[in-house]
Amino acid sequence: RRLVSFGDKELKVRIVAILDYFSQSVLRGLHSYLFNTLKGISQDVTFDQGAFSSKIQDWKYFCSVDLTAATDRFPISVESLVLRGRFPDFYVSAWERVMVGIPFVYQSRTLKYGVGNPMGAYSSFASFALAHHYILYYCCQELGIS
C-alpha cells in the first residue's frame, strides 16, 4: 500500500492511495452499494455534474458546499456512524481497519490516516459523499428547510 502525489489542473497537489488487490476486492461490494445509494439522492450530481445548473435554474437562491481535501480530512468516524445505520458494527469496524488501519508508504516514510480516508480506495468517495449528504440533510431539518 502506498500513496502517490501529483499536481492537477487547479494547481492543487492530489494524494491518491494505491491499495493492495485484496483490500480493494473486499471494498468493492460496499463501493457499489454506496454509489447505487447516491444514485437515489435527487440532490446528488455525482453521475451527471452538468445536471446541476438545470436543477437550480428556477431557484431564488442556492448554497453550494465545496470542501478542500474532503476525503482526506472528513472524519472517518462520521462516515462510520452513517454506515452503522445500515450495516452491523463488526462490518463497519472491519471497513475502518481496511481503509485506515494498515499503514501506507509515501516517499520512503510509513504513514497512517489519522482523520479521513484514502482517496483511491474503493468506497472512499462514496462513503464521504453519503455522510456529507446526511449532514446537510440534518442541518436543513434543524433549520426547517425542505
Model-derived regions, located:
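Core nucleotidyl-transferase/polymerase catalytic module
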Residues: 1-146
